[in-house]
Amino acid sequence: MAASSLWGPAVAGGGESSESEDDGWEIGYLDRAPQKFTAPLPAEEKNEMFKKALTTGDTSLVEELLNAGISVDSSFRYGWTPLMFAASIANVNLVRVLLNRGANASFEKDKQTVLMTACSARGSQEQIIKCVELLLSRNADPNVACRRQMTPIMYAARGGHPQVVALLVAHGAEVNAQDENGYTALTWAAYQGHKNVILKLLELGANKMLQTKDGKTPSEIANRNKHPEIFSLLSLTLNPLEGKIQQLTKEETICKMLATDCDKEKDNLFSSYTAFGELDLFLHGLGLEHMTDLLKERDISLRHLMTMKKDEFLKNGITNKDQQKILSALKELMVEEIKFGELPEVAKLEISGDEFLNFLLKLNKQCGHLITAVQNIITELPVNSHKIVLEWASPRNFTSVCEELVTNVEGLSEEVCRLKDLIQKLQNERESDPTHIPLVEEVSPWKSRLLKRTAVTVCGFGILLGICKLMFQRKLL
């Protein structure tokens, strides 16, 4: 983080800064042009001039002061060296000059290394890549961890820099390292919603099943932080990208990772959550990028693809092999239907506890999927009515259906609450029955918590539909 106003150096995540504003670093501040000195200066004045030269990026003056005896590894406030400051603002020229003059690329302060600072720097990805590459070329260790056990690749992933991530892995960074909370680079990227970093990490062999200390996978972290694209991608069982470059040499890996299409990078950076954005992501996750142009030419959206029959696949030129990949992935994403006709007849009292629990689990899962579906619809609806391209029916029709949905969900909520009360009553009666011998599994309260969670989920779905209805009306005004 940076100190207040224009004062103080940037500190990588995991580092600490002082409360003092009198630190001598004036980032971006220039009240006068740097002046070259012709006569010997006192040490204190030389140090001040050195700081000004660093903050203004005056590499010529920096070299002149180094020639005059200033140490290249001078320690200023916070214990930072000039190289760490230059890395924090991704000033490539300064980093190069300081390294060429012998600056320590492996310097660390309170377990925070120069490489970590560079990976979390302020600046463009191109500048950060060059700084990181310079540091790695001077044997900076990409696997050293800070006090929070975060490594440089985690900082790069959290900052949204896929090429920096690839460069670090090419130089030996452990892609599945975990910090003190069990977060990996993939988890950090999922937390921040960096799609390009997610795709790059999967290609580099990141394990998407590693859990945090509280038992969350990257996909669950993405879902919790409202990143539906990332959640869908990481929820796929298949991972055709995994380990694609594991057999390449370091040089081949660097060339492959850094040779990216600038236009594509720009499009991905500014793309919104659109139907074709979903389609691109879905195909990329299955290794079917070659189908993207074909489907776009035929104006086939992801929603259309998900409902295709076999004859439609063939008609649109999708091979059997590709069909199998798509169908397998869709099977994982589809909501599991509850076949109510096959459920045991409760009235005959022949239903087993396991069967009834299975029913409740399926019902709860369905409600969760329905909530996610409505959230996605809310996200995709245009803000203003003039942005709707195709002709829609009267908005009153949609509002009417939403009202019916709200009514039905409220009814479902009431019935689930009645069911919960009934089960609670049965449970209380059994516990008070002196002839009843409780089973070991009944001692655990997790089943009753599941029922409560189901009731809360249904209630939440009702509230969500109400919000959906209000937002829908507002967007069509």
From Swiss-Prot:
KW Repeat (keyword) present: yes
Region (Disordered): 1-24
InterPro entries according to UniProt: Ankyrin_rpt (IPR002110), Ankyrin_rpt-contain_sf (IPR036770), Asz1_SAM (IPR042650), SAM (IPR001660), SAM/pointed_sf (IPR013761)
Keyword set, alphabetical order: ANK repeat, Cytoplasm, Developmental protein, Differentiation, Meiosis, Phosphoprotein, Repeat, RNA-mediated gene silencing, Spermatogenesis
Modified residues (Phosphoserine): 17-18, 20
PROSITE patterns, A to Z: ANK_REP_REGION (PS50297), ANK_REPEAT (PS50088)
Predominant place of localization: cytoplasm
Annotated transmembrane regions: none
Keyword Cytoplasm in record: yes
GO biological processes: cell differentiation; male meiotic nuclear division; regulatory ncRNA-mediated gene silencing; spermatogenesis; transposable element silencing
Gene3D superfamilies attached to this UniProt entry: Ankyrin repeat-containing domain, Transcription Factor, Ets-1
Region forming the signal peptide: none
Compartments it resides in: Cytoplasm
Superkingdom as given in the UniProt entry: Eukaryota
Domain SAM: 272-334
ANK repeat copies, ranges: 45-74, 78-107, 110-144, 148-177, 181-210, 214-243
Function: Plays a central role during spermatogenesis by repressing transposable elements and preventing their mobilization, which is essential for the germline integrity. Acts via the piRNA metabolic process, which mediates the repression of transposable elements during meiosis by forming complexes composed of piRNAs and Piwi proteins and governs the methylation and subsequent repression of transposons. Its association with pi-bodies suggests a participation in the primary piRNAs metabolic process.
Subunit-structure text: Interacts with DDX4, PIWIL1, RANBP9 and TDRD1.
Listed PANTHER family: ANKYRIN REPEAT, SAM AND BASIC LEUCINE ZIPPER DOMAIN-CONTAINING PROTEIN 1 (PTHR24157:SF3)
Name used for this protein in its record: Ankyrin repeat, SAM and basic leucine zipper domain-containing protein 1
Species name: Echinops telfairi (Lesser hedgehog tenrec)
